[in-house]
Structure formats: structure tokens, C-alpha cells
């Protein structure tokens, strides 16, 4: 009998309050997993992190230097980490909170056009943007009076 997977085997998580380790950019992206450099570069390109990689390099230490990065860069590092974890489902909590509209739109187009399965919590949106999602649960519909 096969043992059921654990929660961490099924889900990867990215939030508006990213966890950044006092380690290299590479470690923060991969958590030490054996991931091909080409795959990491591809995800960095899609999430608009490639300029950071080219400027600082993967060995850039994010200890005290993390405060030199923008909130949007930190969120994108955590999102890249979640994607690179290669879990069946991504749980995304307000991943665009610190992103400008253009970057947010580009990242959402990447996610929507990918084969990734994700559940996303969003609070601020335009109704026309929601038409691209497979399903929507509006928690206001379940609010008790």
C-alpha cells in the first residue's frame, strides 16, 4: 500500500509576506534542491527577476542585503521558489501586493498560460481579469449576517 503524501508534497506556498533566508539568492530560489540552472533561469525570466540575477548573480547573499531589495522582488523570489518546488498545487496569497500593475499582469499571464495549478487569494481586482480564471469563490457570498 502506498503511503499518502504529506501536505508539503502536494502544495507550495507564496505570500505577500515572503520568507527570505540569510543565504544566497540561489538557495532562496531552490532551498538547496537539485534544480537545473536552465530551469531556474527560465522561471526568473518569467517572473522579471532576470535583471537581479544578471546584476547580482546567484551567489548574492540575502542576509542583510535583503533590505536592499524591493518588496516586489522579495515576493517574486518566493513565488519563483514555489514554482521551482514543482508541487502539484501552488497556494498564492496576495502575491501581487507589492507589484506594479504591469509586472503583476505579466506574472498572472505567465501563471494563467502555464500548466500550473494554483489557488490564489486576491482582494483587489478588476472584474474583467476574473474571466481568465477557471473558477472563482467569492467569500462575500458566504458571509453570515
Outline where the language-model segments fall.
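ABC ATPase nucleotide-binding domain signature region
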Residues: 1-34, 122-124, 130
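Short helix-terminating capping/connector loops at secondary-structure junctions
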Residues: 7, 53-55, 92
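ABC-family ATPase nucleotide-binding domain "signature/switch" substructure
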Residues: 17, 28, 61-145
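Conserved "ABC signature" C-loop
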Residues: 18-61
Amino acid at each position: 500500500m502506498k503511503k499518502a503524501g504529506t501536505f508539503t508534497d502536494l502544495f507550495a506556498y507564496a505570500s505577500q509576506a515572503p520568507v527570505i533566508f540569510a543565504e544566497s539568492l540561489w538557495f532562496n530560489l531552490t532551498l538547496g534542491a537539485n534544480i537545473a540552472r536552465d530551469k531556474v533561469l527560465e522561471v526568473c525570466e518569467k517572473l522579471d527577476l532576470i535583471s537581479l540575477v544578471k546584476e547580482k548573480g546567484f551567489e548574492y547573499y540575502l542576509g542583510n542585503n535583503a533590505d536592499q531589495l524591493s518588496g516586489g522582488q522579495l515576493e517574486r523570489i518566493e513565488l519563483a521558489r514555489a514554482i521551482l518546488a514543482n508541487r502539484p498545487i501552488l497556494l498564492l496569497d496576495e502575491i501581487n501586493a507589492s507589484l506594479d500593475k504591469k509586472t503583476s499582469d505579466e506574472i498572472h499571464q505567465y501563471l494563467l498560460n502555464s500548466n500550473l495549478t494554483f489557488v490564489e487569494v486576491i482582494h483587489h481586482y478588476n472584474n474583467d481579469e476574473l474571466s481568465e480564471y477557471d473558477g472563482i469563490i467569492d467569500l462575500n457570498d458566504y458571509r453570515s449576517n
